[in-house]
A protein has these predicted regions:
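Positively charged, low-complexity/disordered segments
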Residues: 456-458
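Nucleotide and nucleotide-moiety/phosphate-recognizing core
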Residues: 36-125, 129, 138-160
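Small-residue (G/A/S/T)-rich helix-start motifs and N-terminal tracts that mark the onset
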Residues: 1-82, 90, 94, 184, ...
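Internal gly/pro-rich beta-alpha loop/helix module
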Residues: 130-221
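Glycine-rich phosphate-binding loop
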Residues: 125-139, 324-331
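Phosphate/ribose-phosphate-bearing ligand recognition and processing surfaces
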Residues: 57-60, 86, 135, 164, ...
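Alpha-helix C-terminal capping/helix-to-coil transition sites in glycosyltransferase folds
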Residues: 121-122, 181, 320
Length: 458
């Protein structure tokens, strides 16, 4: 699935209007119908609902939704904030104001000057339709005060498209008291880039994406740097069967350089994961102290003893290996850095750096210059910051891995709730299949193994 910037989303709307053709007000009605259906599945007609609509198209969505809710027996209290200079509304917002007025609904109030907020209780619902993703500046004045009031009310808050005050992409100066904190965000067609950043979760709450049937040709032809990988995408690309006359050598020979004294568990987990996920042969290069552990715990693996008793001192370079993975439990000292430097200058096979191999890069940045094209780095956020310095938020980290991937012609897999994969062509692919249960020791060793198993077997 493509993820578009705010600017590109405006283009999608405009081209859908042109290609279908459909009027902008009818496209807004389509969005309101999707919103109304989801709200009715979430909120009871007996629940008190307050709708706060801004002067732009986000407000138009809110007013159209209010009208459709009234048609379904709901009794929302609706406030339209027409407080911009010259009291100008967007054309579609103005048209939906007139449609709502014609219903004769008594609890519709247009605010043009001072506003005394209603008493909103914790059992009520607030529908936030003040500002959408097109907002360009942080909220100030009366709108900032209204946002604080909404957040302090304890009500169940539903934001239309995006919480008011939150920008669609980067939020470098996000202030908690100027952004609505929604419990549920109902967005359109595809998620906003901002939804993938951990620092914004407290604003978006649960997110649901509503299909408003933007023109498929428009989506297909509009370029983007951002993509979302779903479980369905992964399932379509998994090799489900093997030829009857298969040989283990058909599925790659992986060299795993991992482990040190007292840290062999990482090597065991990685080797087992590689074998379970389909690689034909696995050789584990570890210090000599690992012999009994590996031969017992992973009998299918070939043990490749290092000359070091307790630490890896060198990593073999041999054409028999179809891919090499380095780092789990390996340790990070001068000998490790030296072994990696020798390897990256000689190797031609696909290479994956994880864990302590990444920490070696943090110690010796020049390693990056010698990495073979399309080497895969698999840091979590702390490993990333050890390598490239402190970063305050996920948005900064995303920019960092994009820069690193394009500069060094490598792939960076930033592990997290929405794992971000930066490719050398500048694109970012988010993986939506993770879950909090993976936040445990060893899961990174297994996850990285799945990456290099793919490299070894292809």
């Amino acid at each position: 699935m493509k993820i578009f910037t705010t600017q590109s989303t405006k283009l999608l709307d405009r081209l859908t209007i042109e290609y279908e053709p459909v009027s902008s007000i009818d496209l807004m009605e389509r969005a309101a119908e999707a919103l109304t259906s989801e709200i009715c599945n979430t909120i009871s007609p007996s629940q008190r609902i307050y709708i706060f609509a801004g002067p732009g198209n986000n407000g138009g969505d809110a007013l159209a939704t209010a009208r459709l809710l009234i048609d379904r027996g709901y009794k929302p209290v609706v406030y339209l904030f027409n407080t911009m200079p010259n009291h100008r509304l967007s054309a579609d917002c103005e048209q939906n104001r007139e449609r709502l007025r014609r219903t004769g609904h008594n609890d519709f109030f247009e605010i043009t000057n001072q506003f005394t907020p209603p008493v909103v209780n914790s059992g009520d619902c607030v529908i936030d339709g003040l500002f959408g993703a097109g907002l360009k500046e942080p909220l100030t004045g009366g709108f900032a005060s209204l946002v604080r009031y909404i957040n302090e009310s304890g009500a169940f808050v539903i934001s239309i498209d995006i919480p008011s005050g939150l920008f669609g992409e980067w939020n470098p100066e996000a202030s908690e008291d100027r952004i609505v904190k929604a419990r549920l965000t109902l967005s359109f067609q595809m998620p906003k880039l901002a939804f993938f950043f951990a620092e914004n979760a407290k604003f978006t709450g649960e997110t649901k994406i509503l299909d408003i049937h933007l023109h498929p040709r428009v989506i297909a032809e509009t370029e983007t740097c951002y993509y979302l990988t779903t479980a369905e995408d992964i399932a379509r690309n998994i090799r489900h069967s093997r030829p009857k006359f298969s040989d283990k050598r058909d599925y790659g020979h992986l060299l795993l350089a991992a482990g040190q004294y007292a840290m062999m568990g990482a090597a065991v987990l990685s080797a087992k994961a590689a074998l379970h996920s389909g690689v034909g042969l696995v050789s584990v290069h570890s210090p000599r102290c690992a012999n009994l552990i590996l031969q017992t715990a992973v009998p299918e693996a070939i043990f490749s003893p290092d000359k070091g008793e307790n630490h890896i001192e060198e990593i073999p370079v041999h054409p028999r290996y179809s891919a090499i993975a380095i780092g789990p439990g390996m340790g990070c000292n001068e000998t490790s850095v030296s072994a990696l430097m020798h390897l990256v200058k000689e190797i031609r096979q696909p290479l994956v750096f994880d864990a302590d191999a990444l920490n070696c890069i943090a110690r010796e940045q020049s390693l990056l210059r010698y990495l073979p094209s399309h080497t895969i780095l698999t840091p979590h956020i702390h490993e990333l910051e050890r390598m490239f310095g402190p970063m305050t938020d996920d948005a900064s980290r995303l920019k960092c891995i994009t820069h690193v991937a394009t500069k060094y012609d490598i792939i960076v897999v930033l592990k997290g709730a929405n794992t971000a994969i930066a490719l050398p062509d500048g694109t970012i692919h988010f993986n939506s299949t993770g879950n909090p249960g993976m936040a445990t020791a060893g899961s990174g060793d297994v996850l990285t193994c799945l990456l290099y198993t793919s490299d070894a077997a292809d």
